[in-house]
């Protein structure tokens, strides 16, 4: 393989983002970019005394070419690369926990459109975010890069990952499960693993295909769950599971075909973990239901609200020693019995274990948890500059009335019977809003307050409520 030029080209600022590096292939990201990113990651890892790096890729069409250059860049910086091949992201995180090195790079476009690709990066056990990602860009710009000969070894991590989950999960009875991999990377393991746990599996779209010919692999959007819902109803299954493109998130559908939102899934997991670990910290992001806090407290846990973003949640988990965390986006992180990284496949297995021990079906079980009326996530298009200035203005000047304010990530306003949130997305030029309340009238009242305060600081905003 020919190494590119000795000095890096200028790389676009836009690809170096809050939780990862991501861009459009052949526009802002190409094989040369991947090489230099490999050089930067390798140099940073070596600076932290970690010469061993695991590398994986998802099923995107650009994957084979980009991963080859990424690995070459790591090799040329002097790192010893374990190439684990086409795997879901959690299997790469697993490799970075159980192989010699604690550095791992996953080449994945996650749930972005098919022409995207990107890099999720762990260096010496720490998932990179914000200024750490900017520092990689800085290394490339200033040519602060090591140059030595490393090595490359092919490693089969999937069998080991498969076995460890299979050995950890104990099923009390057989369940019938529909598994929709959306032609993403989870297809190489999820249906086989769930079958090995003792379930009857009805598999949808398990063939890895970066064209995503059936539906987009993003279970966070209702339109992508329609095939799963229909199949669950048609087959009388106990549960439906949908994985995102790289398998670090899972979507859940009950036997009645109703979607279980991730914050409600976290309620079930929290109760399960707290049974064995009274007093444990449970972390959730600012987008989650207000019903989580009292539920965790009542069952002897310590609820911790934190910023949105898989990298930021993992850092906070490490700091606090929390045993479980979850995000409204569907990332669930188990430290109890697992490694503390977000893993849609392991989370699905834990859900099956709990369900197999319950006499109630999934629909009835989730019905027992408190529920409010809530909106889906509302995205308001702004610019990458104004999204932050609007939030700053709200923090400074807004009048919210009698409420509890949380400003760790945007502005969350909790009233006695409901709440609203507005925050700047870290990944796109939008404001993210969400509302929840006991009654429709209270929901509309809270939306009215947000509408008025947003219009005060940004009169031109086009608000759908």
UniProtKB/Swiss-Prot annotation:
PROSITE patterns found in the cross-reference section: PGM_PMM
Entry's EC annotation: 5.4.2.2, 5.4.2.8
Site positions for Interacts with the biphosphorylated intermediate: 423
UniProt keywords, alphabetically: Alginate biosynthesis, Isomerase, Lipopolysaccharide biosynthesis, Magnesium, Metal-binding, Multifunctional enzyme, Phosphoprotein
Protein name: Phosphomannomutase/phosphoglucomutase
Pathway: Nucleotide-sugar biosynthesis; GDP-alpha-D-mannose biosynthesis; alpha-D-mannose 1-phosphate from D-fructose 6-phosphate: step 2/2; Bacterial outer membrane biogenesis; lipopolysaccharide biosynthesis
Biological role: The phosphomannomutase activity produces a precursor for alginate polymerization. The alginate layer causes a mucoid phenotype and provides a protective barrier against host immune defenses and antibiotics. Also involved in core-LPS biosynthesis due to its phosphoglucomutase activity. Essential for biofilm production.
Family annotation (InterPro entries): A-D-PHexomutase_a/b/a-I, A-D-PHexomutase_a/b/a-I/II/III, A-D-PHexomutase_a/b/a-II, A-D-PHexomutase_a/b/a-III, A-D-PHexomutase_C, A-D-PHexomutase_C_sf, A-D-PHexomutase_CS, Alpha-D-phosphohexomutase_SF
Source organism, top-level taxon: Bacteria
Gene name of the record: algC
Family classification: Belongs to the phosphohexose mutase family.
Cofactor binding annotation: Binds 1 Mg(2+) ion per subunit.
Catalytic residues (positions): 110 (phosphoserine intermediate)
Organism of origin: Pseudomonas syringae pv. tomato (strain ATCC BAA-871 / DC3000)
Catalysed reactions listed for this entry: alpha-D-mannose 1-phosphate = D-mannose 6-phosphate; alpha-D-glucose 1-phosphate = alpha-D-glucose 6-phosphate
Binding site for Mg(2+): 110, 244, 246, 248
Entry binding sites for substrate: 327, 329, 331
UniProt cofactor(s): Mg(2+)
């Amino acid at each position: 393989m020919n190494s590119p030029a000795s000095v890096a080209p200028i790389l676009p600022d836009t690809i170096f983002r809050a939780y990862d590096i991501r861009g459009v292939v052949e526009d802002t990201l190409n094989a040369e970019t991947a090489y230099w990113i490999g050089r930067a990651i390798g140099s940073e890892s070596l600076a932290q005394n970690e010469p061993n790096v695991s590398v994986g890729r998802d099923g995107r069409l650009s994957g084979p070419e980009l991963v080859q250059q990424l690995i070459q860049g790591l090799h040329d910086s002097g790192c010893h690369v374990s190439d684990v091949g086409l795997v879901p992201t959690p299997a790469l995180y697993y490799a970075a926990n159980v192989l010699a090195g604690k550095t791992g790079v996953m080449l994945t476009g996650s749930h972005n459109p098919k022409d995207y690709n990107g890099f999720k990066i762990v260096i010496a056990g720490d998932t990179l975010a914000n200024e750490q990602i900017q520092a990689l860009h800085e290394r490339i710009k200033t040519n602060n890069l090591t140059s030595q000969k490393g090595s490359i070894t092919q490693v089969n991590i999937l069998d080991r990952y498969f076995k460890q989950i299979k050995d950890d999960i104990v099923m009390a009875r057989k369940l019938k499960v529909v598994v929709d991999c959306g032609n993403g990377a989870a297809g190489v393991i999820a249906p086989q693993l769930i079958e090995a746990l003792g379930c009857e599996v009805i598999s949808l779209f398990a063939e890895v295909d970066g064209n995503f010919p059936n539906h987009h692999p993003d279970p966070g959007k209702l339109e992508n769950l329609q095939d799963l819902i229909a199949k669950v109803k048609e087959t009388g299954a106990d549960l439906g599971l949908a994985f995102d493109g790289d398998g670090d998130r899972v979507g859940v559908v009950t036997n009645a075909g109703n979607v279980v939102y991730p914050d409600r899934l976290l309620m079930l997991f929290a109760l399960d973990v707290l049974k064995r670990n009274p007093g444990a910290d449970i972390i959730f992001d600012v987008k989650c239901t207000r019903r989580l806090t009292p539920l965790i407290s009542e069952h002897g846990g310590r609820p911790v609200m934190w910023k949105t973003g898989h990298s930021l949640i993992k850092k906070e988990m490490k700091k606090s020693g929390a045993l479980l965390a979850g995000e409204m986006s569907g990332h669930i992180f188990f430290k109890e019995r697992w490694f503390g990284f977000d893993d849609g496949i392991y989370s699905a297995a834990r859900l099956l274990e709990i369900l197999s021990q319950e006499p109630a079906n999934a629909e009835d079980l989730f019905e027992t948890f408190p529920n409010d009326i809530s909106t889906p996530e509302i995205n308001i298009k702004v610019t990458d500059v104004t999204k932050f200035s609007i939030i700053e203005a709200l923090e400074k000047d807004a009048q919210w009335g009698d409420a509890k304010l949380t400003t760790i990530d945007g502005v969350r306003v909790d009233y006695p019977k409901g709440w609203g949130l507005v925050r700047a997305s870290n990944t796109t030029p939008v404001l993210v809003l969400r509302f929840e309340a006991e009654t429709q009238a209270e929901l509309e009242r809270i939306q009215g307050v947000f509408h008025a305060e947003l219009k005060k600081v940004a009169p031109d905003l086009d608000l759908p409520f």
